A protein has these predicted regions:
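N-terminal anchoring/stem segment of glycosyltransferases
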Residues: 1-71
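Short, charged, surface-exposed secondary-structure boundary motifs
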Residues: 18, 107-112, 251-255
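Conserved beta-strand elements of beta-rich interaction domains across eukaryotes
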Residues: 11-13, 43-46, 81-82, 119, ...
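GT-A fold catalytic core of metal-dependent nucleotide-sugar glycosyltransferases
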Residues: 50-125
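Short beta-strand/turn micro-motifs composed of small residues
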Residues: 8-10, 100, 244
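Conserved beta-strand scaffold positions in the cores of enzyme catalytic domains, especially
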Residues: 38-41, 74, 98, 209-212, ...
Length: 258
């Protein structure tokens, strides 16, 4: 079994140098501690489907098809993430195929995740980037319950919106998904109470293959550091494993001094 950590960082501004100085160095140190091979992609990349955000899931699918073997681990982090606690290993539990966190903003966040390579996880990423699903869903208007407005979820959230459709997760909830039955899986209901027709996975299959990790693994909002407009799942500062500078917030080098 081999373990890989993949990060894609291709910024046109100061963030690229910040990434190189802080994130890249920490990622390499983390890989050395836990025996990961580090895959860092920093060259200028062409958008996929007209969006930078689709590059990562298509790259994952490519690795699953061409490079990775059954039993291997592929962990992916967004480039705006800081690994804080170096002693925690980011891999799924032995019986699971896919692991990710419900973040501070109460999203089933695809900014970071870990894959145990097998037939199920290969099929998962085939579905995440599936062209027919994309054509049918990327222009579909859905309601954001906080704002009461309709827009395309897929146009701004790419693979995350795709995962929501596969697991039947409602687009937004101000009630923590931790308080839902089944983590919010199958919460996207029709008016008749049925789960959305685009949901692919049964609850039984989700529980068999997917592991939901604590919010400390993807801290996107923190008092004193971000707007906290979507601070729904709070994490004490001392418990943060991964600090995610999402949504245009300030990148803070002090997180790399820990």
């Amino acid at each position: 079994m081999k373990k890989y950590l993949m990060v894609i960082a291709s910024y046109p501004d100061w963030r690229q140098e910040f990434f190189k100085t802080h994130m890249s160095s920490r990622n390499k140190e983390y890989c050395q501690i836990h025996g990961f091979e580090y895959i860092e992609i920093t060259e200028k990349l062409e958008p996929v489907r007209g969006k930078i955000g689709w590059i990562k899931p298509f790259k994952v699918q490519q690795l699953l098809k061409t490079t990775l073997k059954d039993g291997d681990i592929l962990t992916c982090l967004d480039a705006d993430m800081a690994i804080v606690k170096k002693d925690i290993q980011y891999i799924p539990s032995s019986a699971k195929s896919f692991a990710y966190s419900i973040d501070s903003g109460n999203t089933h966040c695809m900014g970071s995740y870990s894959i145990r390579v097998n037939d199920w996880s290969r099929k998962l990423f085939d579905l995440i980037v599936d062209e027919d699903r994309y054509k049918n869903l990327h222009n579909q208007l859905t309601i954001h319950e906080r704002f009461g407005t309709y827009s395309s979820f897929w146009e701004g959230f790419y693979d995350q919106a795709s995962w929501y459709s596969l697991a039947g997760i409602k687009r937004h909830s101000d009630k923590p998904f931790w308080e839902y039955s089944d983590y919010g899986w199958h919460s996207d209901k029709t008016l008749t109470g049925e789960v959305n027709e685009w949901c692919k996975y049964s609850l039984e299959e989700l529980y068999e293959h997917v592991e939901i990790l604590p919010t400390a693994w993807n801290v996107t909002e923190l008092e004193g550091e971000s707007s906290c407009e979507f601070l729904i799942n709070k994490t004490p500062k001392e418990d943060v494993f991964i600090r995610h500078f999402a949504g245009g917030q300030q990148w803070r080098k002090e997180w790399f001094e820990k």
